[in-house]
From Swiss-Prot:
<feature type="region of interest" description="Disordered">
    <location>
        <begin position="1"/>
        <end position="23"/>
    </location>
</feature>
<dbReference type="InterPro" id="IPR019842">
    <property type="entry name" value="Uricase_CS"/>
</dbReference>
<comment type="similarity">
    <text>Belongs to the uricase family.</text>
</comment>
<keyword id="KW-0560">Oxidoreductase</keyword>
<feature type="active site" description="Charge relay system">
    <location>
        <position position="39"/>
    </location>
</feature>
<dbReference type="GO" id="GO:0005777">
    <property type="term" value="C:peroxisome"/>
</dbReference>
<dbReference type="Pfam" id="PF01014">
    <property type="entry name" value="Uricase"/>
</dbReference>
<dbReference type="InterPro" id="IPR002042">
    <property type="entry name" value="Uricase"/>
</dbReference>
<comment type="pathway">
    <text>Purine metabolism; urate degradation; (S)-allantoin from urate: step 1/3.</text>
</comment>
<feature type="binding site">
    <location>
        <position position="273"/>
    </location>
    <ligand>
        <name>urate</name>
    </ligand>
</feature>
<keyword id="KW-0576">Peroxisome</keyword>
<dbReference type="GO" id="GO:0006145">
    <property type="term" value="P:purine nucleobase catabolic process"/>
</dbReference>
<feature type="binding site">
    <location>
        <position position="300"/>
    </location>
    <ligand>
        <name>urate</name>
    </ligand>
</feature>
<keyword id="KW-0659">Purine metabolism</keyword>
<comment type="function">
    <text>Catalyzes the oxidation of uric acid to 5-hydroxyisourate, which is further processed to form (S)-allantoin.</text>
</comment>
<dbReference type="GO" id="GO:0019628">
    <property type="term" value="P:urate catabolic process"/>
</dbReference>
<feature type="active site" description="Charge relay system">
    <location>
        <position position="302"/>
    </location>
</feature>
Length: 346
């Protein structure tokens, strides 16, 4: 947020107290233009124990509130403050009372609770990060006595795989997070979901040619190169009533992987990071009508050929097998794609 210009004293004799936007007299010629407080990094694990098959959700939650009053800042008056420790307790109590279905629905419930419970709260912002637990999976392979190794009673067979009923493995492929903002003066709830840290690499079918050729250029045309990136992506929903948040997150992830990798046997050509990014964003808007705008960043993680020319006596010929990973510096490509005539908070 840009700072507002400093206000000048009203007369030459000195400054008089200013009046803030909520009508409260402030002690100096300055005013608080943004404020809020909350509890961050509240870790919660919820276990659903419906029969022998258990389901878990582990979150890291942040809750921030904005009050109508600023008297806690100006006067040191804490009478309107909902303590951050109370906000922490609210996370656990609502998880116990209502359970957890998805990070977005839990964040919506938390935000709405703060506005319903405390009339002096103007805005609630809830941030949730999901810990990626998946069920332990055991393939249905035949043992010496021709018995499937996944025949234990603690496993449920799905698609020739045995999924454990109550054991899980941490699989940090990508982070699922969301931000929910609920304002008392705005009937529309802001729900933003994201993917963070989706690292991918392919060894062929990526090129970069015919770019600007001038006196500053040293990079040759690259007709076939390693393409690696770490995708960060976020999108905002225009409709939160009809969307399945968990399914939508998985759909976006699958779309990104499909446009990056293509068919498992054939692959797909990537003439630039920009084009791959755009195709992914476009397909998300095509497939999920509740998404109004999507933003994506793809840093270009470089892998350069190790130069074997000085070592022809040891390894004669060209090298297309050994590469040097170079994290810094790296290119960064990003774009935001939106439906026409919409406003967003991305």
């Amino acid at each position: 947020m840009f700072a507002t210009p400093l206000r000048q004293p009203t007369n030459a004799s000195g400054a008089r107290p200013a009046v803030s936007m909520d009508g409260q007299e402030t002690p100096f010629q300055y005013e608080i233009t943004d404020h809020g407080y909350g509890k961050d990094a509240v870790k919660v694990l919820h276990v659903s124990r419906k029969g022998p098959v258990h389901t878990i959700q582990e979150f890291e939650v942040g809750t921030h509130l904005k009050l109508y009053s600023k008297k806690d800042y100006y006067q040191g008056n804490n009478s309107d403050i909902v303590a951050t420790d109370s906000q922490k307790n609210t996370v656990y109590l609502l998880a116990k009372k209502y359970g957890i279905e998805s990070p977005e629905k839990f964040a919506l419930m938390l935000g709405q609770h703060f506005l319903n419970k405390y009339s002096h709260v103007e805005e609630a912002h809830v941030h949730v990060e999901t810990y990626p637990w998946q069920r332990v999976c055991q393939e249905e392979t035949k043992s010496v006595n021709n018995q499937g190794q996944g025949s234990c009673n603690n496993f449920t067979s799905i698609d020739n795989r045995s999924l454990h009923n109550h054991a899980f493995i941490f699989t940090p492929t990508a982070l699922h997070y969301c931000d929910v903002v609920i304002r008392r003066t705005d009937p529309k709830q802001t729900v933003i979901t994201g993917i963070k840290g989706l690292r991918v690499l392919k060894t062929t079918q990526s090129s970069f040619v015919n770019f600007v050729n001038d006196e500053f250029r040293s990079l040759p045309d690259q007709y076939d190169r390693i393409f690696s990136t770490v995708v960060d992506c976020s999108w905002e929903y225009s409709d939160t009533e009809t969307v399945n948040f968990s399914r939508a997150w998985q759909t976006v992830k699958n779309i990104i992987l499909r446009n990056f990798a293509g068919d498992p046997q054939v692959g797909v050509s990537s003439p630039s990071v920009q084009h791959t990014l755009y195709l992914s964003e476009k397909q998300v808007l095509d497939v999920i009508p509740q998404v109004s705008v999507i933003s994506m960043t793809m840093p270009n993680k470089h892998y350069f050929n190790f130069d074997t020319k000085p070592f022809q006596k040891i390894v004669p010929g060209d090298n297309n097998e050994v590469f040097i990973p170079v994290d810094k510096p790296h290119g960064t490509i990003y774009a935001q794609l939106a439906r026409k005539n919409i406003s967003s908070h991305l």
